[in-house]
């Protein structure tokens, strides 16, 4: 949960912050000794909008059709993404290592690594045949085309994958208040 100072220091400052989810997604405990309750603080700082998807799930019910639309061929593809954060280089590189092992069993397997807007693919140690890209608009379309996705534990990506009924593996960041709640949220959906 970001502080009020963060909101005020933005150029221009903003007076509204939206939280994709519900108040129960925020831990009902303090930030620490003598600090406010996280959920109470979030209720004061955010307007909770529920779970919002920028797509109609019915449009993406055939992953082969979505693959064709996006220019992928029919070979199996794994999409590995860390979302909008710069944390997660290790997850992407782990996907590259796992890909090399899996490719021995599934020779036509493809891996696309999405670094997001804050991490460049230049510093990643990945096999040469892995496609690494930065920010991808409408990433949910690529999730819909995937045969497997590997993501960090962010609620938006995991809920999109759940809505799209695509298999995924997620790695929540330890100590991250949102990502520690994701497994509970997913069991409700």
Go through the PLM ranges and name each one.
Residues 31-34, 120-122, 157-158, 177-184:
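Short, glycine/polar-rich helix-capping loops at beta-to-alpha or helix-loop-helix junctions
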Residues 19, 48, 80, 111-113, ...:
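Structural beta-sheet core signal
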Residues 138-181:
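A donor-sugar binding/catalytic signature common to diverse glycosyltransferases
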Residues 28, 53-145:
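Donor-nucleotide binding loops and adjacent catalytic segments primarily
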């Amino acid at each position: 949960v970001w502080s009020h100072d963060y909101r005020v220091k933005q150029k221009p400052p903003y007076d509204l912050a939206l939280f994709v989810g519900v108040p129960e997604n925020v831990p009902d405990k303090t930030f620490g000794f003598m600090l406010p309750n996280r959920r109470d603080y979030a209720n004061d700082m955010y307007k909770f909008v529920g779970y919002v998807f920028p797509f109609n799930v019915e449009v993406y019910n055939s992953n082969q059709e979505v693959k064709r639309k996006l220019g992928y061929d029919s070979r199996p593809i794994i999409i590995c993404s860390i979302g909008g954060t710069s944390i997660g280089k290790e997850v992407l590189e782990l996907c590259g290592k796992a890909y090399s092992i899996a490719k021995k069993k599934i020779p036509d397997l493809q891996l696309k690594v999405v670094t997001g807007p804050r991490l460049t693919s230049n510093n990643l140690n990945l096999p040469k045949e892995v496609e690494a890209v930065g920010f991808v608009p409408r990433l949910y379309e690529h999730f819909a085309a995937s045969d497997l996705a590997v993501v960090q534990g962010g609620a938006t990506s995991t809920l999109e994958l759940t809505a799209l009924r695509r298999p995924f593996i997620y790695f929540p960041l330890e100590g991250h208040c949102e990502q520690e709640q994701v497994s509970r949220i997913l069991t409700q959906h």
